Each structure stands twice: as C-alpha cells, then as structure tokens.
C-alpha cells in the first residue's frame, strides 16, 4: 500500500517552525562554537528568533479569514485564538530571555542602597556545571574557569516551541507530544540555580516526578477516549460523543485527561508542586514558567473544553465549578500565611488559576475573550513581579543570593523607591485594584461567568479577591511603612534591557487598567476556535 505524502502548510506553521529552528541552531552552536562566543550567539539567536516568530504570527494572523485553518492533516489548528496565545507566549519569551541573559550573581556594593552588577557575562545566577555535585571540586573548578550554562537558551526555545504547539493541537496525540516538549526542558531549567543548589535540585526532582505522573494520567485518558470514540481529533471526538448514548468510558477518559491539563495550569488539588518549584527554581525561570506555561496550558484546556467536549457540557461544568472554587479558596487562604515572597506569589498564582477557570466555565464567546485578555494581563504582571524579586539581594551582598524573606523587606521601598513602586503596581494588579490590568481582567471573567449563570462562582471569586488584597498590601506596607532593619536587602542594578523589559511590564499593567479597550477588542476578535 502506498501512503500519500502529507501536505504541509509551511506558511501557517511558520511561527512554530522558526522557534524550533532557533532551538536546533542553539544546540548546534553549543556543539561547534568556541566557548567565548556561545553566550552572545545564544542570546542573539533566542531574542532574534523570538522576534522573527512574533512577526510571523502577526503576518499569519492578518491572512486568516473566518474561523481558521487546519494544518498537517488536521493535527494543528491555526485560528485566531491560537495566534493570540502564541503571540502572548512569544512576548513573554522575549522578556524572559532578557532577564535570563542579563542576570548576574556577582555583585559589588557601590552605594549604600544599590548593588551594581559586575561587567561580566550574564547567567551567573545559574550553576556553571549542572552535572556537578553541589559543593564538589568539579563545581568549584567550573566556577574558577568562569563557565556559563549557555545551554539554557536552546532549552528555553525548545520549551517555547512546545508551548506554541500545545494550544494549537487539534488532536490528542499532538497535544501529548507538545506537552512533553514544553515540560522536559523546564524540568532541567528548574535545577540550574547557582545558589541553594540542593533546593533547586529538589524542586526539579519534584516537578519531574509529579509531571511524569500527570503525563501518564493524560496519556491514559487519551487511550480511553480513543477507545470510546475511535478517533484522536478533537472535532471527531465531539461528533462521536454526540452520537453515543453510553458515555461512561468517555467520561473516565475526560477525567484522566483533565488531570494532566489541570496539573499544568496548577489547579487544586494538582497544585502541590507549585510552591516548592517556584521557590527553588532560578527566579527568571520561575517567571517564565508562571507566565508562559499558564498561557499555553489554558490554551490547550480551552480547545479541549470548547471543541471536543460540548456534548458533555452538563458533566464537566459542575466538576470545573468545584475545582475553580477550591483553587481560589485554597490559593488565597494559603498565601495569607506565607513569609517568603516567592512562595506567596506561587500560591497567588494558584488563586489566579481559579479566577481564569471562572472564564473557562462561562463556556461562551465572552468567557473565551475574557480568558484570553486575563492571560495577557496576568503574564505581564507576573513577569515584572518576578523580575523585581530577582533583583532583591541579601544585605551582605554575598554571592548575590536573593533574599525573598518578607521579614527582611522592611523599608525596602524607602531605600529603593522606584523598585518599590513598580513591585507595588504589580501587586495591586494581582489584587484587582481599579486602574490596573488586574481589575479589568477580573471584571471581564466575572461578568462572563455571571452572564452564564455562574453567580455563586463569581461571589466566591470576589470574596477571594478581597482576602487576597491583604497579603499583597502587607508586602507594600512592609516596604514603605516599616522601619529598616539591619537585614534589609539591597537591590541589584539591572542591565539596560532588563530595565526596559520591567518598564514595559509596568506600562502594560497600567495601560490595560486605564485604556484596555484595544486589547479587549483584539481578544474579542481572537475568540474563535476552529471547530
């Protein structure tokens, strides 16, 4: 039997192909370029490739008419929602690469209130030798040699490639492959912190083990759905479910599939990895995971729920109700007791997953549009917040180790007012205070949910937002209205690109709170999934 050659729509796949090509080029650069050239080459490849891919997304989006097109024998759906999410992932990637590249652990006191980064290549906050045992002679030798872990950039681009395919997947097998491609590099990058190596490696191990379990659940769910419907394509599953009378096997498959997706977004009760991983991973990687991974994972969840599961609407909606309520409640209540800023932001991200699920549960175009807007607003605020947390270093400045202990942040805003004001802006956005992007995004998802009859869910969300305001304001009060102590940390001086990226995050957070209509209109136009 002669199999026909598949028709590959290279134009529609251009953004994804560009990112994967950059990742492959980065691997080749690691293999063949001299060590002294690798850092500059990798940063240029990552930033340039992400920018070119973003341009490709815009070009493809301008050529899309109607609901979109299927590519590669229906395995990939290129529609407005996919391109919107891919563009968001690429914007986050550009900022994340800047924070990774310009980050340095070697600091020297220049003024009483500032630590200036030494004029050395970046990546000094990442271990020089990932395979070395912490504290071993091999690690010390790598440090003396000035080694840098430039493999970080191709790993990040491979993960970005998976993130771009994940929300575009139109069949479950492609979705599983994309899930693994985006996850495996993240497992490695979580364990690359120079300081607190054991904590970082513990975080990577926990993430890997729990991620492997969730992937197994996902794959088993795929098998059950295939057995129940005879197809792996999302439209095919929808049509088969609509024609069936016995949904027991399909429901079991959907439940197992949901475990994998809800683990990746960090919903309760699949959130246990988030606090440890966010605290132990290098802070630029934490910001990258907290923003980009959520965008990709929610894109995949939206596609499964809106394209494949309309016939099971009455079955999955009550389950997501319960998960959203648990996620908002557990995330908010647990964050109140945190004394480490990174762990507080981790539990805060869990609560935000519940808010975003509120938009998903609406199951209408308004809910889809509100969810897309929320993901954009949350991504910029999250990247900015973690970028600033990564600049706060211990009072003695030794090795440039971060100090995320909230009790040490007393008076930090008085010592470094610009940093304090910017972080306060991001925290107020997380709390949903008016004139910030967080207020508009929460209002959008709550309004969509209320219009779909989920008023009790909205009430829980509003109460959770009110409680969450406490621990955000607590950080602001500590920075500006508490006297300095001897443990008050210093703020490292970021590079020019990092300053620009943080400024962009701040401006976007404010502009989306004051004049959100252009992005809301863009999200409305993007709220079309290929069915």
Curated annotation (Swiss-Prot):
Instruction: Give the EC number.
Output: 7.1.1.-
GO terms, molecular function: NADH dehydrogenase (ubiquinone) activity; NADH:ubiquinone reductase (non-electrogenic) activity; quinone binding
Primary location group: membrane
Q: What class of enzyme is it?
A: translocase
Cellular-component GO terms for this entry: extracellular region; plasma membrane
Recorded hits in InterPro entries, A to Z, give:
NADH-Q_OxRdtase_suN/2, ND/Mrp_TM
Report which reactions are catalysed by this protein. a quinone + NADH + 5 H(+)(in) = a quinol + NAD(+) + 4 H(+)(out)
Where, by residue number, does the polypeptide cross the bilayer?
A: 8-28, 41-61, 81-101, 146-166, 172-192, 208-228, 250-270, 282-302, 318-338, 350-370, 372-392, 418-438, 453-473, 500-520
Q: Where does the source fall among the domains of life?
A: Bacteria
Please report a single Pfam family linked to this protein: Proton_antipo_M
Q: Where in the cell is it found?
A: Cell membrane
Q: How does it assemble?
A: NDH-1 is composed of 14 different subunits. Subunits NuoA, H, J, K, L, M, N constitute the membrane sector of the complex.
Protein name in the entry: NADH-quinone oxidoreductase subunit N
Organism, per UniProt?
Mycobacterium tuberculosis (strain ATCC 25618 / H37Rv)
């Amino acid at each position: 039997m002669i199999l026909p050659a598949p028709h590959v729509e290279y134009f529609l796949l251009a953004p994804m192909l560009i990112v994967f090509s950059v990742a492959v080029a980065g691997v080749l650069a690691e293999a063949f370029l001299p060590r002294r050239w690798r850092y500059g080459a990798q940063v240029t490849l990552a930033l340039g490739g992400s920018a070119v891919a973003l341009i490709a997304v815009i070009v493809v989006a301008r050529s899309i008419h109607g609901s979109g097109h299927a590519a590669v024998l229906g395995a990939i759906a290129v529609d407005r929602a996919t391109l919107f999410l891919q563009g968001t992932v690429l914007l986050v990637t550009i900022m994340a690469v800047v924070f990774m590249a310009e980050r340095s652990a070697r600091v020297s006191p220049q003024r009483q209130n500032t630590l200036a980064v030494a004029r050395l290549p970046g990546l000094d906050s990442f271990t020089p030798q990932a395979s070395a045992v912490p504290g071993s002679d091999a690690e010390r030798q790598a440090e003396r040699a000035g080694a840098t872990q430039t493999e970080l950039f191709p790993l990040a681009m491979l993960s970005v490639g998976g993130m771009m395919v994940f929300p575009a997947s139109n069949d479950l097998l492609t979705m599983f492959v994309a899930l693994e491609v985006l996850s495996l590099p993240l497992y490695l990058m979580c364990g690359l912190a120079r300081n607190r190596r054991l904590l970082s490696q513990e975080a990577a191990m926990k993430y890997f083990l729990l991620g492997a379990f969730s992937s197994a659940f996902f794959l088993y769910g795929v098998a059950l759905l295939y057995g129940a419907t005879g197809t792996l394509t999302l439209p095919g599953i929808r049509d088969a479910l609509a024609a069936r009378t016995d949904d027991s096997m399909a429901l079991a498959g959907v439940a197992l599939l949901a475990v994998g997706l809800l683990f990746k977004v960090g919903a309760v009760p699949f959130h246990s990895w988030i606090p440890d991983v966010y605290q132990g991973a290098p802070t630029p990687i934490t910001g990258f995971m907290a923003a980009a991974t959520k965008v990709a994972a929610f894109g995949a969840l939206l596609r499964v729920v809106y394209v494949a599961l309309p016939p099971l609407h009455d079955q999955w909606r009550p389950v997501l109700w319960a998960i959203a309520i648990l996620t908002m409640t557990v995330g908010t209540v647990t964050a109140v007791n945190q004394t480490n800023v990174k762990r507080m932001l981790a539990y805060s991200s869990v609560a935000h997953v519940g808010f975003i699920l509120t938009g998903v549960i609406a199951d209408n175009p308004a809910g889809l549009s509100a969810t897309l807007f929320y993901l954009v607003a949350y991504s910029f605020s999250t990247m900015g917040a973690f970028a600033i947390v990564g600049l706060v270093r211990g009072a003695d400045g030794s090795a440039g180790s971060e100090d995320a202990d909230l009790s040490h942040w007393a008076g930090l805003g008085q010592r470094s007012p610009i940093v304090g004001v910017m972080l306060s802006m991001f925290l107020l956005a997380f709390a949903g205070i008016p004139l910030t992007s967080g207020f508009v995004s929460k209002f959008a998802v709550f309004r969509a949910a209320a219009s779909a009859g989920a008023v009790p869910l909205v009430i829980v969300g509003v109460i959770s937002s009110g409680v969450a305001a406490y621990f955000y304001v607590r950080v602001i009060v500590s920075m500006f209205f508490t006297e300095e102590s001897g443990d008050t940390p210093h703020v490292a001086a970021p590079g020019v690109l990092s300053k620009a990226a943080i400024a962009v995050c701040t401006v976007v957070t404010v502009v989306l709170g004051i004049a959100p209509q252009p992005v809301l209109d863009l999200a409305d136009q993007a709220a079309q999934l290929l069915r």
